[in-house]
Amino acid sequence: DSGLLAVSVESFRDYELKNAWTWEHQALTRARFCAGDSDVGRRFEEIRCEILRLPRELAKLKEEVVAMRHKMYDAHALKSETEFALKHDAGGIIDVEFIVQYLVLGYAHQHASLTGNLGNIALLRMAGELGLIDPQQAEAVGNAYREYRRLQHAKRLSAFPKAPIPREGIEQHVAAVNDLWKAVFAN
């Protein structure tokens, strides 16, 4: 069965604390209350921050984030030498988002500011300022993400919104994202 799931706020908290998968916590890094009772929204945000600020074993977290990324890559990546799928290819949007999600989940217990509703570029910059990643890499990947989103928005207005783009012209962005991915997940 599928459909809208309605549970109490405390049941949601209990599930997130005891049963949620890592990918569900990754989704919480992006989740925001947007409509409804403001008390429920406030409580949701408290729970979201509580969950994101839990200490985690970094090696296990890395393993789970990388495994999920591999599943997505295997299912959706273009894997072309001349064309690039902005969202799914290695060095693309999902890699940036997974890096940020890992940094939030891995370090928010030490740096609560990582749970703010700031966006990926600001969170990359903050991670650089906190010494979690190299600040120059943070800036380069932030620039890559900004360009990817610009290209993604332009494609959505075109007749072919899901078509890949040429790799030519974005190689430096792909390389920057791949370099940060290796720096974060290779050790």
Regions found by a protein language model. Name each.
Residues 1-187:
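A nucleotide- and high-energy phosphate-metabolite-utilizing enzyme signature
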